[in-house]
Amino acid sequence: MENTSLRSCRKDGVVYARGATDDKGQLLTHLLAAEAWMKTIGDIPLNLIYLIEGEEEIGSPHLEEFILEHREKLQADVVVISDTSQFGPEMPALCYALRGLTYMEFIVTGANQDLHSGMFGGIVPNPNQVVAAIVAEMKGLDGRIRIPGFYDGVKPPEGWEVAEYEKLPWNDSDLAAQLGLPGLSGEKEYPAPVRRWYRPTLDVNGMYGGYAGKGAKTVIPSIAGAKVSMRLVSGQNPERVAELFEAFVRERVPDDCKVEVIRYQNSPAIIIPVDHPAMQAAKVAFRNGFGKEPLLIREGASIPIVAFFVDTMKMPSILFGFGLPDDNPHAPNEKFTLADFHRGIATSAHFMDVYSEAAG
Protein backbone atom coordinates (compact mmCIF):
# COMPACT_ATOMS: atom_id res chain seq x y z
CA MET A 1 0.00 0.00 0.00
CA GLU A 2 1.19 3.53 -0.79
CA ASN A 3 0.32 6.25 1.70
CA THR A 4 1.86 9.35 0.18
CA SER A 5 0.15 11.87 2.42
CA LEU A 6 1.27 13.02 5.84
CA ARG A 7 -1.95 11.73 7.37
CA SER A 8 -2.08 8.32 9.01
CA CYS A 9 -4.41 5.55 7.91
CA ARG A 10 -5.22 2.01 9.00
CA LYS A 11 -5.78 -0.97 6.71
CA ASP A 12 -5.81 -4.74 7.29
CA GLY A 13 -4.38 -4.50 10.79
CA VAL A 14 -1.57 -2.15 9.82
CA VAL A 15 -1.09 1.55 10.61
CA TYR A 16 0.55 3.58 7.84
CA ALA A 17 2.07 6.87 8.98
CA ARG A 18 5.30 8.82 9.02
CA GLY A 19 7.13 7.72 12.15
CA ALA A 20 4.82 4.75 12.69
CA THR A 21 7.71 2.44 13.50
CA ASP A 22 10.64 4.90 13.58
CA ASP A 23 10.02 5.90 16.17
CA LYS A 24 6.74 7.31 17.44
CA GLY A 25 4.89 3.99 17.43
CA GLN A 26 7.58 2.15 19.35
CA LEU A 27 7.85 4.99 21.86
CA LEU A 28 4.10 4.86 22.40
CA THR A 29 4.25 1.19 23.43
CA HIS A 30 6.11 2.14 26.60
CA LEU A 31 3.78 5.02 27.44
CA LEU A 32 0.71 2.84 26.97
CA ALA A 33 2.24 0.03 29.02
CA ALA A 34 2.67 2.41 31.95
CA GLU A 35 -0.86 3.76 31.48
CA ALA A 36 -2.34 0.24 31.41
CA TRP A 37 -0.38 -0.71 34.54
CA MET A 38 -1.66 2.29 36.49
CA LYS A 39 -5.25 1.74 35.36
CA THR A 40 -5.35 -1.97 36.16
CA ILE A 41 -2.85 -2.53 38.98
CA GLY A 42 -1.96 0.82 40.48
CA ASP A 43 1.45 2.20 41.31
CA ILE A 44 4.29 1.21 38.99
CA PRO A 45 7.06 -0.61 40.94
CA LEU A 46 9.77 1.41 39.21
CA ASN A 47 10.70 5.08 38.93
CA LEU A 48 10.26 5.78 35.21
CA ILE A 49 11.88 8.64 33.31
CA TYR A 50 10.79 9.26 29.72
CA LEU A 51 13.31 11.09 27.56
CA ILE A 52 11.80 12.06 24.21
CA GLU A 53 13.67 14.07 21.58
CA GLY A 54 13.10 14.68 17.88
CA GLU A 55 16.57 15.29 16.47
CA GLU A 56 17.84 11.71 16.16
CA GLU A 57 17.77 11.75 12.35
CA ILE A 58 20.15 14.72 12.29
CA GLY A 59 22.51 13.25 14.87
CA SER A 60 20.86 14.58 18.06
CA PRO A 61 23.18 17.62 18.21
CA HIS A 62 21.73 18.93 21.49
CA LEU A 63 20.86 15.73 23.33
CA GLU A 64 24.16 14.98 25.06
CA GLU A 65 24.45 18.56 26.32
CA PHE A 66 20.88 18.41 27.63
CA ILE A 67 21.49 15.12 29.45
CA LEU A 68 24.67 16.41 31.07
CA GLU A 69 22.88 19.58 32.20
CA HIS A 70 20.19 17.45 33.87
CA ARG A 71 22.44 14.55 34.83
CA GLU A 72 21.14 14.09 38.38
CA LYS A 73 17.49 14.00 37.29
CA LEU A 74 18.17 11.62 34.41
CA GLN A 75 20.51 9.15 36.11
CA ALA A 76 18.99 5.66 36.02
CA ASP A 77 19.83 2.00 36.61
CA VAL A 78 19.01 1.02 33.04
CA VAL A 79 18.01 2.64 29.75
CA VAL A 80 15.42 1.09 27.43
CA ILE A 81 15.52 2.20 23.79
CA SER A 82 13.16 1.01 21.06
CA ASP A 83 14.85 1.91 17.79
CA THR A 84 15.57 -1.56 16.42
CA SER A 85 13.29 -4.26 14.99
CA GLN A 86 12.40 -7.91 15.20
CA PHE A 87 14.36 -10.25 12.96
CA GLY A 88 11.22 -10.95 10.95
CA PRO A 89 7.49 -11.65 11.30
CA GLU A 90 6.80 -13.70 14.45
CA MET A 91 10.53 -13.60 15.25
CA PRO A 92 11.01 -11.23 18.22
CA ALA A 93 14.61 -10.27 18.85
CA LEU A 94 16.76 -8.61 21.46
CA CYS A 95 19.64 -6.62 20.02
CA TYR A 96 22.79 -6.80 22.14
CA ALA A 97 25.30 -4.99 19.92
CA LEU A 98 25.48 -2.00 17.59
CA ARG A 99 28.18 -1.04 15.14
CA GLY A 100 29.87 2.30 15.59
CA LEU A 101 30.16 5.02 12.96
CA THR A 102 32.88 7.24 11.57
CA TYR A 103 31.65 9.63 8.88
CA MET A 104 34.13 11.56 6.74
CA GLU A 105 34.24 13.85 3.74
CA PHE A 106 37.22 14.88 1.66
CA ILE A 107 37.29 17.72 -0.87
CA VAL A 108 39.98 17.98 -3.54
CA THR A 109 40.67 21.36 -5.17
CA GLY A 110 42.64 21.87 -8.37
CA ALA A 111 42.49 25.12 -10.34
CA ASN A 112 40.77 28.19 -8.94
CA GLN A 113 37.84 27.79 -11.35
CA ASP A 114 36.21 25.24 -13.64
CA LEU A 115 38.13 24.98 -16.90
CA HIS A 116 37.47 24.01 -20.54
CA SER A 117 38.82 20.52 -21.20
CA GLY A 118 39.84 21.44 -24.74
CA MET A 119 41.89 24.42 -23.68
CA PHE A 120 43.37 23.01 -20.49
CA GLY A 121 43.04 19.21 -20.65
CA GLY A 122 46.43 17.57 -20.24
CA ILE A 123 48.09 20.43 -18.37
CA VAL A 124 45.90 20.83 -15.25
CA PRO A 125 44.78 18.35 -12.57
CA ASN A 126 41.26 16.94 -12.62
CA PRO A 127 39.86 16.69 -9.05
CA ASN A 128 37.15 14.29 -10.23
CA GLN A 129 39.75 11.76 -11.28
CA VAL A 130 41.80 12.27 -8.13
CA VAL A 131 38.76 11.58 -5.95
CA ALA A 132 37.75 8.58 -8.07
CA ALA A 133 41.24 7.08 -7.84
CA ILE A 134 41.39 7.48 -4.06
CA VAL A 135 37.92 6.03 -3.56
CA ALA A 136 38.70 3.08 -5.83
CA GLU A 137 41.82 2.28 -3.83
CA MET A 138 40.05 2.40 -0.45
CA LYS A 139 38.05 -0.77 -0.97
CA GLY A 140 38.40 -3.62 -3.42
CA LEU A 141 35.58 -5.25 -5.34
CA ASP A 142 36.06 -8.22 -3.00
CA GLY A 143 34.80 -6.03 -0.15
CA ARG A 144 38.19 -5.84 1.56
CA ILE A 145 39.07 -2.38 2.90
CA ARG A 146 42.60 -1.34 1.87
CA ILE A 147 43.31 1.38 4.43
CA PRO A 148 46.36 0.16 6.42
CA GLY A 149 45.50 -0.57 10.04
CA PHE A 150 41.75 -0.38 9.46
CA TYR A 151 41.09 -3.90 10.78
CA ASP A 152 43.25 -3.53 13.89
CA GLY A 153 41.34 -4.80 16.93
CA VAL A 154 38.60 -6.58 14.96
CA LYS A 155 37.72 -9.93 16.52
CA PRO A 156 35.69 -12.86 15.17
CA PRO A 157 32.35 -13.76 16.80
CA GLU A 158 32.55 -15.91 19.89
CA GLY A 159 31.30 -19.49 19.84
CA TRP A 160 27.95 -18.70 21.49
CA GLU A 161 27.40 -15.90 18.97
CA VAL A 162 27.98 -18.28 16.08
CA ALA A 163 25.42 -20.62 17.63
CA GLU A 164 22.94 -17.72 17.90
CA TYR A 165 23.21 -16.49 14.30
CA GLU A 166 23.12 -20.05 12.99
CA LYS A 167 19.64 -20.32 14.53
CA LEU A 168 18.40 -17.56 12.24
CA PRO A 169 16.37 -18.41 9.15
CA TRP A 170 18.86 -16.54 7.01
CA ASN A 171 18.63 -17.00 3.24
CA ASP A 172 21.11 -15.11 1.07
CA SER A 173 19.18 -15.72 -2.15
CA ASP A 174 15.87 -14.52 -0.74
CA LEU A 175 17.44 -11.35 0.65
CA ALA A 176 19.23 -10.64 -2.63
CA ALA A 177 16.00 -11.14 -4.59
CA GLN A 178 14.14 -8.84 -2.20
CA LEU A 179 16.75 -6.15 -2.92
CA GLY A 180 16.69 -6.74 -6.68
CA LEU A 181 20.22 -8.15 -6.74
CA PRO A 182 21.63 -11.31 -8.36
CA GLY A 183 23.44 -12.10 -5.10
CA LEU A 184 24.95 -10.58 -1.98
CA SER A 185 28.39 -9.00 -2.13
CA GLY A 186 31.22 -8.39 0.31
CA GLU A 187 33.91 -10.52 1.90
CA LYS A 188 32.79 -13.94 0.71
CA GLU A 189 35.00 -15.77 3.21
CA TYR A 190 32.54 -14.67 5.91
CA PRO A 191 28.85 -15.66 6.14
CA ALA A 192 26.40 -12.86 5.39
CA PRO A 193 25.33 -12.37 9.05
CA VAL A 194 28.98 -11.92 10.01
CA ARG A 195 29.52 -9.40 7.21
CA ARG A 196 26.39 -7.53 8.24
CA TRP A 197 26.93 -7.45 12.02
CA TYR A 198 30.45 -8.50 13.05
CA ARG A 199 32.64 -6.98 10.33
CA PRO A 200 33.38 -3.29 9.78
CA THR A 201 32.44 -1.64 6.50
CA LEU A 202 33.36 1.32 4.34
CA ASP A 203 30.78 2.79 1.98
CA VAL A 204 30.95 5.78 -0.33
CA ASN A 205 27.71 7.63 0.35
CA GLY A 206 28.10 10.27 -2.32
CA MET A 207 30.49 11.82 -4.83
CA TYR A 208 30.30 15.21 -6.46
CA GLY A 209 32.21 17.40 -8.89
CA GLY A 210 31.99 18.81 -12.39
CA TYR A 211 28.91 18.65 -14.59
CA ALA A 212 26.28 15.92 -14.21
CA GLY A 213 23.24 17.54 -15.82
CA LYS A 214 21.59 16.77 -19.15
CA GLY A 215 23.66 16.91 -22.27
CA ALA A 216 27.38 17.54 -22.52
CA LYS A 217 29.62 20.12 -20.90
CA THR A 218 33.35 19.68 -21.39
CA VAL A 219 34.43 20.93 -18.01
CA ILE A 220 37.39 20.16 -15.77
CA PRO A 221 36.02 20.87 -12.30
CA SER A 222 37.76 23.07 -9.79
CA ILE A 223 36.64 20.88 -6.90
CA ALA A 224 35.37 17.37 -6.31
CA GLY A 225 34.66 15.39 -3.21
CA ALA A 226 33.30 12.26 -1.61
CA LYS A 227 31.42 11.43 1.57
CA VAL A 228 32.29 8.13 3.22
CA SER A 229 30.79 6.26 6.15
CA MET A 230 32.55 3.51 8.05
CA ARG A 231 30.63 1.18 10.35
CA LEU A 232 32.89 -0.03 13.12
CA VAL A 233 32.85 -3.02 15.43
CA SER A 234 34.01 -3.63 18.98
CA GLY A 235 37.78 -3.31 19.22
CA GLN A 236 38.04 -0.42 16.76
CA ASN A 237 38.68 3.12 17.97
CA PRO A 238 36.65 5.67 15.95
CA GLU A 239 39.24 8.44 16.39
CA ARG A 240 42.01 6.12 15.27
CA VAL A 241 40.01 5.04 12.22
CA ALA A 242 39.38 8.69 11.32
CA GLU A 243 43.12 9.37 11.55
CA LEU A 244 43.92 6.37 9.34
CA PHE A 245 41.34 7.50 6.78
CA GLU A 246 42.69 11.05 6.68
CA ALA A 247 46.28 9.86 6.32
CA PHE A 248 45.27 7.50 3.50
CA VAL A 249 43.61 10.36 1.60
CA ARG A 250 46.34 12.93 2.13
CA GLU A 251 49.09 10.54 1.03
CA ARG A 252 47.34 10.06 -2.33
CA VAL A 253 46.49 13.63 -3.28
CA PRO A 254 49.02 14.86 -5.88
CA ASP A 255 51.12 17.95 -5.26
CA ASP A 256 49.17 20.00 -7.81
CA CYS A 257 45.95 19.69 -5.75
CA LYS A 258 44.84 20.67 -2.26
CA VAL A 259 42.65 18.57 0.02
CA GLU A 260 40.36 19.28 2.96
CA VAL A 261 39.27 16.39 5.19
CA ILE A 262 36.18 16.84 7.36
CA ARG A 263 35.16 14.63 10.28
CA TYR A 264 31.41 14.64 10.89
CA GLN A 265 30.67 11.90 13.35
CA ASN A 266 32.53 9.45 15.55
CA SER A 267 30.76 6.96 17.78
CA PRO A 268 32.07 3.61 19.05
CA ALA A 269 30.49 0.20 18.68
CA ILE A 270 28.53 -1.04 21.67
CA ILE A 271 28.14 -4.53 23.14
CA ILE A 272 25.57 -5.09 25.88
CA PRO A 273 26.39 -8.06 28.16
CA VAL A 274 23.68 -10.64 27.60
CA ASP A 275 23.94 -11.79 31.21
CA HIS A 276 23.05 -8.35 32.58
CA PRO A 277 19.93 -8.52 34.82
CA ALA A 278 18.08 -6.10 32.54
CA MET A 279 18.80 -8.28 29.49
CA GLN A 280 17.64 -11.37 31.36
CA ALA A 281 14.46 -9.54 32.40
CA ALA A 282 13.94 -8.46 28.80
CA LYS A 283 14.16 -12.07 27.60
CA VAL A 284 11.41 -13.06 30.03
CA ALA A 285 9.34 -10.02 29.02
CA PHE A 286 9.57 -10.90 25.32
CA ARG A 287 8.70 -14.51 26.09
CA ASN A 288 5.57 -13.35 27.90
CA GLY A 289 4.66 -10.56 25.48
CA PHE A 290 5.25 -12.41 22.20
CA GLY A 291 4.73 -15.96 23.39
CA LYS A 292 8.15 -17.15 22.26
CA GLU A 293 11.83 -16.88 23.14
CA PRO A 294 13.50 -13.83 21.57
CA LEU A 295 16.43 -14.27 19.23
CA LEU A 296 19.69 -12.61 20.24
CA ILE A 297 20.96 -10.52 17.36
CA ARG A 298 23.34 -7.71 16.56
CA GLU A 299 22.48 -4.63 14.52
CA GLY A 300 24.66 -3.30 11.74
CA ALA A 301 23.51 0.28 12.22
CA SER A 302 24.53 2.78 14.88
CA ILE A 303 22.64 4.64 17.61
CA PRO A 304 25.26 7.09 18.91
CA ILE A 305 23.32 8.04 22.05
CA VAL A 306 23.59 4.44 23.28
CA ALA A 307 27.37 4.78 23.44
CA PHE A 308 26.92 8.03 25.37
CA PHE A 309 24.59 6.40 27.89
CA VAL A 310 26.94 3.44 28.38
CA ASP A 311 30.35 5.15 28.32
CA THR A 312 29.63 8.61 29.72
CA MET A 313 26.56 8.14 31.90
CA LYS A 314 27.57 4.60 32.96
CA MET A 315 24.00 3.41 32.40
CA PRO A 316 23.52 -0.04 30.81
CA SER A 317 21.18 0.16 27.84
CA ILE A 318 18.97 -2.47 26.27
CA LEU A 319 17.32 -2.38 22.86
CA PHE A 320 13.70 -3.45 22.47
CA GLY A 321 12.56 -3.73 18.84
CA PHE A 322 8.89 -4.33 18.07
CA GLY A 323 8.73 -3.34 14.39
CA LEU A 324 9.66 -5.37 11.31
CA PRO A 325 12.58 -5.00 8.89
CA ASP A 326 10.16 -4.17 6.05
CA ASP A 327 8.31 -1.41 7.93
CA ASN A 328 9.80 1.14 5.50
CA PRO A 329 11.13 3.72 7.97
CA HIS A 330 11.47 7.21 6.43
CA ALA A 331 9.35 6.19 3.43
CA PRO A 332 5.89 7.56 2.55
CA ASN A 333 4.34 4.16 3.29
CA GLU A 334 6.05 3.59 6.65
CA LYS A 335 4.00 1.16 8.71
CA PHE A 336 3.58 -0.62 12.03
CA THR A 337 1.57 -3.83 12.41
CA LEU A 338 -1.05 -3.44 15.12
CA ALA A 339 -0.44 -6.98 16.40
CA ASP A 340 3.22 -6.13 17.01
CA PHE A 341 2.23 -2.78 18.51
CA HIS A 342 0.00 -4.54 21.05
CA ARG A 343 2.61 -7.20 21.77
CA GLY A 344 5.12 -4.42 22.30
CA ILE A 345 2.87 -2.84 24.93
CA ALA A 346 2.55 -6.19 26.70
CA THR A 347 6.30 -6.78 26.54
CA SER A 348 7.04 -3.38 28.04
CA ALA A 349 4.61 -4.03 30.90
CA HIS A 350 6.12 -7.47 31.56
CA PHE A 351 9.58 -5.92 31.60
CA MET A 352 8.55 -3.45 34.31
CA ASP A 353 7.24 -6.36 36.36
CA VAL A 354 10.20 -8.71 35.92
CA TYR A 355 12.93 -6.08 36.20
CA SER A 356 11.42 -4.53 39.32
CA GLU A 357 11.66 -7.94 41.02
CA ALA A 358 15.22 -8.52 39.77
CA ALA A 359 16.32 -5.06 40.91
CA GLY A 360 14.79 -5.56 44.32
Label for each model-derived stretch:
Residues 45-126:
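Histidine/acidic-residue-rich, glycine-tolerant segments that coordinate divalent metal ions
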Residues 1-49, 343:
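Active-site metal-coordination/substrate-binding segment of hydrolases
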Residues 15-17, 112-118, 213-214, 329-331:
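Short small-residue beta-strand/loop micro-motif enriched in glycine and branched aliphatics
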Residues 18-25, 57-58, 93-94, 119-122, ...:
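Alpha-helix capping and helix-loop boundary segments enriched in small/acidic/polar residues
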Residues 32-39, 133-137, 230, 350-353:
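Short glycine/serine- and small hydrophobic-enriched flexible loop segments
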Residues 88-89, 146-223, 231-244, 252, ...:
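An extended, acidic, His-containing surface patch that forms the Zn2+-binding/catalytic region
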Residues 105-109, 137, 207, 227-231:
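Residue-level recognition of well-ordered beta-strand positions that form the cores
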Residues 65, 121-142:
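A short core secondary-structure module
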